[in-house]
């Protein structure tokens, strides 16, 4: 019911805005007076336009990155540095064996595996 009271004011407001916009429009020009050169721009205008576009693009990208960081901030898991050398792979496999052994209540970790095994073998070779 309130809509019928509001709609005449809405229509009058739209008409008033339309008339104001129409009256403020640029006056008509004759075809002989100063033909518009909309396709021709000087180099300075192009530089300013390019700078404005790049600035807006950078602001948009930084805003997107900030939003991604906010959403991923709660989901970020700690990642260890990966190592593909033979020593790292051997220690990784030893860790897997140790975990598998602890699940089965048996220790499957070989006696030659552990902390600084690689350095101990070097010392034995030098001696």
From Swiss-Prot:
Gene Ontology CC terms, in alphabetical order: extracellular space
TM stretches of this protein: none
Intrachain disulfide bonds: 83-88
Source organism, top-level taxon: Eukaryota
GO biological process terms on file: adenylate cyclase-activating G protein-coupled receptor signaling pathway; regulation of cytosolic calcium ion concentration
Signal peptide (UniProt feature, chain positions): 1-25
MF annotations from Gene Ontology: calcitonin receptor binding; hormone activity
Pfam families attached to this UniProt entry: Calc_CGRP_IAPP
Subcellular location(s) per record: Secreted
Main location: secreted
Propeptide part(s) removed at maturation, as residue ranges: 26-79
Family note: Belongs to the calcitonin family.
PANTHER family: CALCITONIN GENE-RELATED PEPTIDE 1, CALCITONIN-RELATED
Protein name as catalogued: Calcitonin receptor-stimulating peptide 1
Source organism: Canis lupus familiaris (Dog)
Gene: CRSP1
